[in-house]
Amino acid sequence: MTQDPGETPAGTAGAATADLTLDAEVAAADVPPAIIAQSLGQYLRASWLRVRSGNSGVLPVVLAIVIVAVVFEILTPEHAFLRPSNLVFIFGLSTVYMVLAIAETAVLLLAEVDLSVGAVALIGGVIAFKLVQQPGANWPWWLALLAALVICGAIGAAQGALTAILRIPSFVVSLGGFLLFSGILIVVLGGADASVNLSTSMTNQRIIYDMVQGLISPVVAWIVLAVLVVAYGASQWLRTTSRRRQGLTAPPLSLIAIRIALVAIIGAAVVIICSVNRGSALKAVTGVPWVIPIVLVVLGGWTVLLQRTHFGRYVYAIGGNPEAARRAGVSVPAIRIWAFALCSATAALGGILLGSFFFGEYSTNTADPGQLVLYSIAAAVIGGVSLFGGRGKAIHGILGGLLIGSIAYGVSLLSLGSLSTPLEYILPGAVLLAAVLIDVLSRRGSGGVNRV
């Protein structure tokens, strides 16, 4: 039988139909490309369609990190920005912003904001440092950490209740909280000129000190990395095969393999960088800072909470359309209160890491709570979390925090004298405005649909 010249060849009909279906699903529904696509080619096509529709994901912040690294490497004296010692320092500095950005993400997803996160973080750090002091309370380090998280979580819950139950705008509540807790911070410290210092000779205090300053030996780091990569690969593989057995759509296996390889490459790069001697020939300093696995635990916990639990789905639903979520039976006030509580508890951990980063010392000069909250919001939004709610992930806070830390340290390396301090504000501010502009334009281009 002769085929009509205008007829689609039988061999390509299925592929053409699949591509058209893919385009329609990506354009009409907010479904991750990994779920829609049945092959690596379709995944790349779907991802590109999402970028064109305004949902660029982590692409802008990843490109920004690369550009910042290249620019500072060129501009810094002796091209020192990408030296292993400086990269490890950036890791340590950025982890504070990462944790605070993840904390802020919890409320930004609800289209709310917490301006007190910086002051609450510092209070959490001071509480933990005070409780392990000897003489003093001399609590076990783990109990001191738990107490700081619980106290700060209660602070967040109280602010969340004012917002959720009394309908006071979160901006007003948290701004009042920022001023209130900034004053309480001075009281907890013991005065404007007081300070709290950890002793490295006492095990109970040394553990908190080592959260940022402590190092994991390269050998142990390689073993841990291998275990993590295998565990991650196994979880991805089992989840994919389980979905296929149930007749559900699942990411193509080639994409799973690429993800596993990417995690392994990034992890290996970090271990290699941290294994380079950052000290001297007489006193070598090598190893992965403890804070890196700590932040990975925070990232993993928040990712599971937001992506794999009813609480996370409710958060996205409320951020996208609170009235629709309420009509669907979601307890909107309860979710808001929990989000603020978890935000403040996570911020407390960031405050503890900040004190450890400054070699176990806390004073009124350790950090400016106003700068901390601005950097935390900037890191979250720059990373890809929407100020309008309903869109963002914990990983966005990680990437945004890394970018903020890179800019802050890069400016200090330029040795610009009196210009250094202004640039530490100007550059993140410019990047933040660009991120918000991209967010606004993407929403206009997509008809205002919230996408996760």
Language-model-detected regions and their locations in the chain:
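Membrane-interfacial amphipathic/re-entrant helices at transmembrane-helix boundaries
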Residues: 6, 32-99, 134-143, 249, ...
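Single transmembrane alpha-helix segments in multi-pass membrane proteins
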Residues: 69-74, 84-134, 159-171, 324, ...
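Inter-helical junctions in multi-pass inner-membrane proteins, predominant
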Residues: 78-86, 186, 190-192, 274-292, ...
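Transmembrane alpha-helical segments in multi-pass inner-membrane proteins
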Residues: 112, 340-347, 351, 355-426
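Alpha-helical transmembrane segments within multi-pass membrane transporters and channels
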Residues: 137-179, 400, 404
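Loop-to-transmembrane alpha-helix initiation sites
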Residues: 141, 170, 197-202, 217-227, ...
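Transmembrane helix-bundle core of multi-pass membrane transporters
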Residues: 182-306, 417-418, 446-452
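Membrane-helix/interface signature in polytopic inner-membrane proteins
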Residues: 236-253, 301-340
